[in-house]
């Protein structure tokens, strides 16, 4: 271990106590106000998140989105969009705009178990046109 002249880790505490610089008088009941809360992470339905992906606070992941492995997501991801990288950027849409709109209206994830079971082959095999045709009355 090397220590620079500005930081002698052998003689003093190395923790910087950031909470106490500006909020020393803060009551324990208000401790979360010391940090900038960017909001909850909201993950839609039918989303796939790759291994070790990081999603930052306040980000919304749209229905049907795919997050690549080890992506760092700092901004909202639109529905049925594939993103990857650091920071995550759009790679492409999973479907054309019309199909995306129909899938968002279809909301198959809200169906009963029996309804999903009947359409499972279409969903699992990626037969989106057949799924939409079979369920036109829902659109």
Where are these regions (language model features)?
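C-terminal segments of enzyme domains that contribute to small-molecule binding surfaces
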Residues: 14-55, 87-139
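Activation loop
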Residues: 5-6, 39, 69, 99
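Left-handed beta-helix
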Residues: 39, 44-45, 50-51, 56-57, ...
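Single conserved hydrophobic/aromatic residue that forms the stacking wall/gate
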Residues: 1-6, 10
